[in-house]
């Protein structure tokens, strides 16, 4: 697992209070991990702070799974 993936997983566990085993790449923040819309906004803000990237609102709306977050952050960091 990449450094970005590990960090994303840690942030999700901390913010949503879910079991680490549930935080798989395919896990949906809302459907699988019980997040609501406010939780997803807070997660995006935490990702921005942790990785030093900006995630515009239109991109944030497309981040629905753990893998979506990892892929987006890795892409932004590579720019």
Swiss-Prot record:
Its main location: cytoplasm. It comes from the Bacteria. GO terms for molecular function: acyl binding; acyl carrier activity; phosphopantetheine binding. The modification O-(pantetheine 4'-phosphoryl)serine is found at residue 37. It is found in: Cytoplasm. GO terms for biological process: lipid A biosynthetic process. InterPro entries: ACP, ACP-like_sf, PKS_PP-bd, PP-bd_ACP, Ppantetheine_attach_site. Residues 2-77 form the Carrier domain. Pathway: Lipid metabolism; fatty acid biosynthesis. SUPFAM superfamilies: ACP-like. Keywords: Cytoplasm, Fatty acid biosynthesis, Fatty acid metabolism, Lipid biosynthesis, Lipid metabolism, Phosphopantetheine, Phosphoprotein. The keyword Lipid metabolism applies. 4'-phosphopantetheine is transferred from CoA to a specific serine of apo-ACP by AcpS. This modification is essential for activity because fatty acids are bound in thioester linkage to the sulfhydryl of the prosthetic group. GO terms for cellular component: cytosol; membrane. Carrier of the growing fatty acid chain in fatty acid biosynthesis. Belongs to the acyl carrier protein (ACP) family. HAMAP family: Acyl_carrier (MF_01217). This is Acyl carrier protein. It comes from Acidiphilium cryptum (strain JF-5). The gene is acpP.
């Amino acid at each position: 697992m990449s450094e970005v993936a590990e960090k994303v997983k840690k942030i999700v566990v901390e913010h949503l209070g879910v079991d680490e085993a549930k935080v798989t790449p395919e896990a949906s923040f809302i459907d699988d991990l019980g997040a609501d819309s406010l939780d997803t906004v807070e997660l995006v803000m935490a990702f921005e702070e942790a990785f030093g990237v900006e995630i515009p609102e239109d991109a944030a709306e497309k981040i629905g799974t753990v893998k979506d977050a990892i892929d987006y952050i890795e892409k932004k960091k590579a720019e």
